[in-house]
Amino acid sequence: MEYDVVIVGGGPSGLATAIKFAQLNKENNTNYSICLLEKGSEIGAHILSGNVFQPNALDELIPNWKELNAPLNVPVKKDKIFYFLKNMGIPVPPFVMPAMNNHGNYIISLGNLCRWLGEQAEQLGVEIFPGFPASKLLYENDKVIGVQTGDMGISENGELKPANEPGINIKAKLTILGEGCRGHLGKEVINKYNLSEDKDPQHYGIGFKEVWKIDPKLHEEGLVIHTNGWPTPDIAAGSYFYHGENNEAYIGFVIPLDYQNPHLSPFDEFQRWKQHPVIKKYLTNGERLSYGARALIKGGLQSLPKMDFPGGLLIGCNAGTLVFSKIKGSHTAMKSGELAGKHAFDKIHNNIETSFDSVIKESWIYNELYKSRNFGPIFHKFGALLGACLLYTSPSPRDTNP
């Protein structure tokens, strides 16, 4: 199979790429073909996250999203930040953490937003194939020329079942990787083409996420809570509790994977956090609806690899566009996808050979990452408490530890 563009990953970045490219197709009366591969059974199947969503990228990609009934139904009404001691929460004044000001943002289900984006993409002519993971990259003369989907009908022992189907080769003029954090194809091109040369080592965290139905008497639609401190006061961990619609709450706990204590269990720390009085009061008599975990990429600007490679692009969290100081990456991922869609169209239709890295550097993605560039390195080098004190006074540190 051959397409003009193949996109790997049906998250915010991949879908934004597909939509922007298809919009330009329509505007220019062209008929370039676009294929998007998603490993989940449907778009959004692997996206559990409740999310405080900054809508500026969506405003730019689909300005009339309100008229099209995008699932942004709960504007943020109130922000609360706490530093936790074991049995109490100390309120933190908003001016101490200005990046946590969520005025103008929305509490959403990111999975629902991606499903809606998938519908918009299909209406524009994008071919979306859920249930087809991209397992291998295809090369020709040291250039990526497409992907191979995974073989179907393989037993747990790696043997072919009678009804097996071999993977399909999908070739394209441009292959765009939006797999999310630590996507295996993204790791392959970063290593093969030395895209992280002269960059600081990348940093990762693990995030545990749950969706709860809580007591309507305790539910405050539009309330956003962020906490740090106990139960991991010596680690730059963080947590959140978002009051969404329909008496649902999205909760999460993030621990960086550079912790030194070999006996620490991130999952158990999450369970302890849920026992804190500020959190427990909401969850008592509630019902957990779903749960999951995922890796986060949080090295920021200093660790951002080159996003161009021969035959393709890296976008979103496959590259590392998350803004750690905000604990937000959906808006930057979506914007990187929009820019990738335009870059791909210019390259294929107009034969414009510009650097995608220069496109990123001229966008507000770079400005956001630049403003938060000190956040991760200072916490990594000096710890949670001293790091917080130095955050706005220290010059930009380099963080050479992975």
What are these regions (language model features)?
Residues 124-276:
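Predominantly flavin-linked oxidoreductase catalytic cores and closely associated redox partners
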Residues 5-30:
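N-terminal Rossmann-like FAD-binding beta1-loop-alpha1 element of flavoenzymes
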